[in-house]
């Protein structure tokens, strides 16, 4: 049984502590793929949920003073339960507040995968970095940033951009699937975090090949969505992306994946 078949057979429970802007899209995307999202944010039930969950997604897009302690508490409970965590440090370089929170979070919680654009990941290893928001910086050296971040933070790194870079231990892989329309809808990167979590299967040390498959399945679905005859902009693309995630299969993944080890 391949990983995508396993995902659809097991319907892994993924706890999505994500931002308010993308909750609906993230939930629908994971359901389309075959996972079972739970949008629970109450620390009072975190122990029960993480015990059952395949993984926990933490996305700080709408971080506030009111929820920061809950995020850290839920992360620590996931660590105690052996539940892998995908961390998405949205716009970490945009404010001192976000930088300080991420520095504290990564000091107190062990994460399995960190996903972000090059600017966000660079900020995590150099908190003097500044950025304008969630947009990526195409001029940054994503390969070296990913390599340094994987070593410094001792975790798997996924850097998104025109090409995606995955680094784990000393291995680095560049992926070249995807669609420019992903940058025209809100929550595309946030959903990818959920897709990564869906592929973890309670494994806190996933192989880089598993991460490659998770990212590529999503990006290939985006390519197919863009190519659909009725898609003529972001609105039709968004709904078609859900359909393509639903229709994705292992043969399509293997035939379409564009990857190279660096």
UniProtKB/Swiss-Prot annotation:
<keyword id="KW-0547">Nucleotide-binding</keyword>
<dbReference type="GO" id="GO:0009229">
    <property type="term" value="P:thiamine diphosphate biosynthetic process"/>
</dbReference>
<dbReference type="Pfam" id="PF02110">
    <property type="entry name" value="HK"/>
</dbReference>
<comment type="function">
    <text>Catalyzes the phosphorylation of the hydroxyl group of 4-methyl-5-beta-hydroxyethylthiazole (THZ).</text>
</comment>
<feature type="binding site">
    <location>
        <position position="187"/>
    </location>
    <ligand>
        <name>substrate</name>
    </ligand>
</feature>
<feature type="binding site">
    <location>
        <position position="160"/>
    </location>
    <ligand>
        <name>ATP</name>
    </ligand>
</feature>
<keyword id="KW-0808">Transferase</keyword>
<comment type="similarity">
    <text>Belongs to the Thz kinase family.</text>
</comment>
<keyword id="KW-0784">Thiamine biosynthesis</keyword>
<dbReference type="GO" id="GO:0000287">
    <property type="term" value="F:magnesium ion binding"/>
</dbReference>
<keyword id="KW-0460">Magnesium</keyword>
<dbReference type="GO" id="GO:0009228">
    <property type="term" value="P:thiamine biosynthetic process"/>
</dbReference>
<dbReference type="InterPro" id="IPR029056">
    <property type="entry name" value="Ribokinase-like"/>
</dbReference>
<dbReference type="InterPro" id="IPR000417">
    <property type="entry name" value="Hyethyz_kinase"/>
</dbReference>
<comment type="pathway">
    <text>Cofactor biosynthesis; thiamine diphosphate biosynthesis; 4-methyl-5-(2-phosphoethyl)-thiazole from 5-(2-hydroxyethyl)-4-methylthiazole: step 1/1.</text>
</comment>
<keyword id="KW-0479">Metal-binding</keyword>
<feature type="binding site">
    <location>
        <position position="39"/>
    </location>
    <ligand>
        <name>substrate</name>
    </ligand>
</feature>
<protein>
    <recommendedName>
        <fullName>Hydroxyethylthiazole kinase</fullName>
        <ecNumber>2.7.1.50</ecNumber>
    </recommendedName>
</protein>
<keyword id="KW-0067">ATP-binding</keyword>
<dbReference type="GO" id="GO:0004417">
    <property type="term" value="F:hydroxyethylthiazole kinase activity"/>
</dbReference>
<dbReference type="GO" id="GO:0005524">
    <property type="term" value="F:ATP binding"/>
</dbReference>
<keyword id="KW-0418">Kinase</keyword>
<feature type="binding site">
    <location>
        <position position="115"/>
    </location>
    <ligand>
        <name>ATP</name>
    </ligand>
</feature>
């Amino acid at each position: 049984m391949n990983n995508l078949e396993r995902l659809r057979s097991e319907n892994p429970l993924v706890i999505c502590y994500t931002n308010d802007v993308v909750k609906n899209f993230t939930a629908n995307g994971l359901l389309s793929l075959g996972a079972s999202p739970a949008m629970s944010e109450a620390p009072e039930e975190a122990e029960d949920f993480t015990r059952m969950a395949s993984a926990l997604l933490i996305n700080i897009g709408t971080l506030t003073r009111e929820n920061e302690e809950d995020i850290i508490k839920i992360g620590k409970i996931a660590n105690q339960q052996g539940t892998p965590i995908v961390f998405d440090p949205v716009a970490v370089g945009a404010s001192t507040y976000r930088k300080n929170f991420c520095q504290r979070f990564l000091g107190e919680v062990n994460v399995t995968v960190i996903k972000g654009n090059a600017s966000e990941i660079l900020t995590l290893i150099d908190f003097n970095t500044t950025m304008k928001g969630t947009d990526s910086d195409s001029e940054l050296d994503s390969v070296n940033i990913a390599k340094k971040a994987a070593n410094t933070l001792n975790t798997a790194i996924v850097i998104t951009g025109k090409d995606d870079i995955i680094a784990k231990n000393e291995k680095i892989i560049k992926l070249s699937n995807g669609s420019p329309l992903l940058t025209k809808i809100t929550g595309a990167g946030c959903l990818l975090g959920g897709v990564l979590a869906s592929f973890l299967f309670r494994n806190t040390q996933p192989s880089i090949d598993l991460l490659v498959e998770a990212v590529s399945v999503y990006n290939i679905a985006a390519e197919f969505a863009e190519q659909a005859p009725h898609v003529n902009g972001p609105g039709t693309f968004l709904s078609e992306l859900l359909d393509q995630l639903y229709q994705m299969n292992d043969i399509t993944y293997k035939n379409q994946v564009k990857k190279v080890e660096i």
